[in-house]
């Protein structure tokens, strides 16, 4: 509760650390009166007590670049919507970890993972020909799906939403992780027409590119 002993102690500790850090930085930088250093005291971390999530994340973390916080968001959403009609899309799946996480809880509909497996689209300006994820491989994802025995889970190689093999009618969750504005915009306008009432679209890397 707001104002309890723990909360007040964290606020005191935050203010103390801000003072110490500002003091030492002042020897190296010119700090203005209005300049502030922000230290978060947020302690809400529900994934710590979710033993089922922790168990699976310890395994799935080898197949994703998502941190525990973002992975838990996908886990929780897929749990909440597991009985809703519609498919789950993971656009920009890389090694498949984010899709695997959502697939583990799903009961109705398919989980479909999409990736070009070629890096960024050549039309993406500064990003063209920069295949920084050189270990992308669709066969690796297919084998992992089979190894994990994930039901109704598939992977397609494409620059989403072009040339999709499976017909998508309704979407209950879409995780967009395509790194660039142009690709994200194109995918979003396609997905929003098919998202169900109460469905969710998650933008990863928001504000980075």
State each model region's role:
Residues 1-62:
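Membrane-proximal basic amphipathic "stem/tether" segments
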Residues 47-63, 75, 82-209:
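S-adenosylmethionine/decaboxylated-SAM
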Residues 66:
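Residue-level marker of regulatory loop/turn positions in helix-turn-helix DNA-binding domains and
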Residues 69-73:
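N-terminal pre-P-loop "Q-motif" helix
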């Amino acid at each position: 509760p707001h104002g309890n002993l723990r909360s007040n102690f964290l606020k005191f500790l935050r203010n103390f650390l801000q003072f110490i850090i500002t003091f030492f930085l002042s020897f190296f930088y010119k700090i203005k009166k209005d300049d502030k250093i922000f230290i978060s005291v947020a302690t809400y971390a529900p994934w710590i007590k979710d033993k089922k999530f922790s168990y699976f994340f310890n395994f799935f973390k080898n197949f994703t670049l998502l941190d525990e916080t973002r992975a838990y968001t996908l886990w929780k959403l897929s749990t909440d919507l597991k009985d809703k009609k519609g498919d789950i899309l993971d656009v920009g799946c890389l090694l498949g970890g984010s899709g695997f996480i959502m697939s583990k809880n799903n009961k109705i509909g398919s989980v479909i993972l999409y990736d070009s497996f070629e890096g960024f689209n050549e039309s993406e300006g500064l990003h063209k020909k920069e295949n920084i994820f050189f270990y992308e491989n669709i066969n690796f994802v297919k084998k992992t799906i089979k190894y994990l025995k994930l039901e109704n889970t598939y992977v397609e190689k494409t620059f989403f939403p072009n040339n999709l093999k499976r017909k998508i009618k309704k979407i209950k969750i879409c995780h967009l992780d395509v790194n660039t504005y142009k690709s994200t915009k194109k995918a979003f306008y396609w997905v929003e027409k098919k998202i169900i009432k109460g469905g969710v679209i998650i933008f990863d890397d928001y504000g980075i590119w």
